[in-house]
A protein has these predicted regions:
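Hydrophobic core segments of alpha-helical transmembrane domains in multi-pass membrane transport
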Residues: 13-15, 58-61, 87-92, 127-138, ...
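Transmembrane helix-bundle core of multi-pass membrane transporters
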Residues: 75, 79-144, 168-171, 190-199, ...
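Cytosolic-side transmembrane-helix boundaries in multi-pass membrane proteins
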Residues: 159-167, 241-277
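Transmembrane alpha-helical segments in multi-pass inner-membrane proteins
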Residues: 180, 190-256
């Protein structure tokens, strides 16, 4: 589960986006950018202090999320097209930093994604559980959480009800950017270096987890318990394929087929609900 923690953190953010009817394909690239920039800033010749590394990482993630949100809400571009574009831009920016080839020697960052409690429970598991509990409480007991479900269920009615739809959608992308930043720091902690390809393909894994966990692709439905269970299921399947030495290409086929299957089930469920009404 420790190796799958990055996807759990990313799922925390994209679920919030999807509940409000949004979509974010740039999560892997944002985490990769945060990771490689943070790793470069920790190099001996630069030596940025650890607390400032966290501030810079979170600022990068939230800023990119803010840009995504503003483009989607203020310009009106489809979220898939918007985040696909930012995915390419950010991934190219990652390769700009590639010639630095930074290694991670910062002891705190090394332990951030590797340490265990009593040599049994990974810190990363605790992070995910804490994130999920906090977000679940926000969704259940705050006006912001209720507004997310309302916007995802029917954006037009939400606007008529006076809910600040655009502002809330922008906030969801900023939240997603925050979790991308945490995921990027976990990546370089676990892998020991900063590489431009880190985070590539994370979108496939995370979307599969979130949709399998019961989050509707169109928004307005989902909870963190379902996503947590889906994370355990997908993590077990992935680790099982690694232990069985399943070829890499076949693992990708299985993951892609699983994503198509869960989205198809979601679409059929929505169609059936429409027929009932």
């Amino acid at each position: 589960f420790n190796n799958f923690a990055v996807f759990g953190v990313l799922a925390s953010g994209i679920m919030i986006v999807m509940l409000a009817g949004g979509f974010d394909l740039s999560i892997g690239s944002i985490s990769g950018l945060v990771g490689i920039v943070s790793a470069v800033l920790m190099m001996d010749k630069i030596g940025v202090p650890t607390p400032l590394i966290f501030v810079i990482a979170i600022t990068i993630g939230c800023t990119v999320g803010l840009i995504n949100g503003l483009i989607i809400t203020k310009i009106g571009i489809n979220p898939i097209i918007t985040t696909l574009g930012t995915l390419a831009i950010i991934r190219g920016t990652c390769y700009f930093w590639a010639n630095q080839n930074p290694r991670i020697y910062n002891m705190f960052i090394q332990g951030f994604g590797r340490k265990f409690i009593a040599d049994i429970v990974p810190y990363t598991t605790v992070y995910i559980i804490v994130f999920f509990i906090i977000l679940a409480l926000i969704l259940k007991f705050t006006r912001f959480g209720r507004n997310l479900y309302t916007i995802g269920g029917n954006e037009t009615l939400a606007r008529l009800a006076g809910i600040p739809v655009d502002r809330i959608k922008i906030i969801t992308y900023v939240i997603s950017g925050f979790f991308c930043a945490i995921a990027g720091l976990l990546l370089i902690s676990q892998l020991g270096s900063g590489r431009p390809e880190y985070g590539t393909g994370a979108e496939l894994e995370v979307l599969t987890i979130v949709v399998l966990g019961g989050v509707a692709v169109g928004g307005g439905k989902g909870n963190f318990l379902g996503v947590f269970i889906a994370l355990l299921i997908i993590g077990s399947i992935s680790n099982g394929m690694v232990m069985l030495d399943v070829p890499v290409f076949l693992r990708q086929v299985v993951k892609g087929a699983l994503l198509v299957m869960v989205i198809s089930i979601d679409a059929l469920r929505n169609r059936r609900n429409l027929q009932l009404y």
